[in-house]
């Protein structure tokens, strides 16, 4: 009897202590995924004639310095999406671009098609280029443009959510990589550019550089103001809701008058 009493004496406090332990609450719901339109940016709604010029695939040893000279003459800041392999060969050009107020973005190490690669391979392309940019200019890029604009939805999410990049596409494409001639490159840019546009070009093609003097002058004449992509994103304003169409009140249709029957 004494043994049972001793066992009960130790058991009761243990049961009380267990009962006083806080029970695990329900699991916190995971935050909803970021909508695709907030992960990738092709253009923005702005109050004002602001646009962003972007140049891909450099730096080019001969052409990028010529472009930088021209941009300096016009007091224009642009955004350069650079290739890691090219940075490794010419870090001094990237350093000059950053020093003169241009923005440097990540455009992969060797320009592969992300959508055809494993996630690990994509991460490697991005991180290697990130390290090359950081080594050249002393700061980490925050913008990324996937080569060809090709990237899967899953890749978009980990590039944005895990790696911390804004994914930048474009809404003006002069197809300058096809080298259609400087005049055509210029006319396409002038025709398609609107306030909030992100203009795609490549500073590795001579025709693109040849098209820029007339293009920049005409864009200035049209009243456009040039900013980097990050500056353009900061100028973003909500898109106003569409104006509802006026609803016309239905017109009452008069009832037909029935002639009295002759038969009464």
Set out the residue ranges of the language-model regions:
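Terminal accessory/targeting
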Residues: 1-52, 69-79, 195-264
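Residue-identity detector for glycine
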Residues: 6, 25, 48, 58, ...
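Alpha-helical protein-protein interaction elements
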Residues: 10, 47, 73, 99-101, ...
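Active-site beta->alpha N-cap acidic-glycine motif
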Residues: 28-125, 132-135, 139, 234
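Hydrophobic/aromatic residues located in beta-strands of well-ordered beta-sheets
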Residues: 78, 104, 142-144, 167, ...
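Catalytic domains of cell-wall/extracellular-matrix polysaccharide-remodeling enzymes
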Residues: 88-89, 112-240
């Amino acid at each position: 009897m004494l043994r049972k009493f001793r066992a009960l004496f130790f058991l009761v406090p243990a049961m009380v202590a267990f009962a006083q332990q806080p029970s695990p609450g329900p699991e916190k719901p995971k935050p909803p995924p970021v909508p695709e339109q907030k992960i990738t940016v092709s253009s923005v709604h702005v109050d004002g004639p602001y646009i962003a010029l972007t140049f891909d695939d450099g730096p080019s040893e001969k052409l990028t310095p010529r472009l930088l000279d021209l941009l300096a003459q016009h007091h224009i800041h642009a955004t350069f999406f650079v290739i890691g392999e090219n940075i490794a060969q010419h870090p001094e050009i990237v350093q000059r671009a950053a020093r003169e107020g241009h923005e440097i973005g990540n455009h992969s190490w060797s320009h592969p098609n992300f959508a055809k690669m494993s996630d690990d391979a994509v991460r490697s392309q991005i991180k290697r280029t990130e390290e090359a940019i950081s080594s050249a200019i002393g700061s980490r890029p925050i913008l990324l443009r996937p080569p060809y604009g090709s990237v899967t939805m899953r890749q978009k999410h980990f590039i944005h959510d895990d790696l911390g990049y804004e994914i930048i596409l474009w809404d003006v494409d002069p197809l300058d990589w096809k080298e259609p001639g400087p005049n055509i490159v210029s006319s396409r840019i002038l025709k398609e550019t609107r306030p909030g546009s992100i203009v795609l070009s490549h500073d590795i093609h001579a025709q693109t550089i040849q098209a820029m003097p007339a293009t920049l002058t005409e864009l200035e004449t049209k009243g456009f103001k040039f900013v980097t992509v990050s500056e353009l994103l900061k100028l973003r304003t909500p898109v106003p809701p569409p104006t509802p169409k006026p609803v016309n009140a239905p017109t009452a249709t008069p009832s037909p008058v029935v002639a009295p029957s002759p038969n009464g």
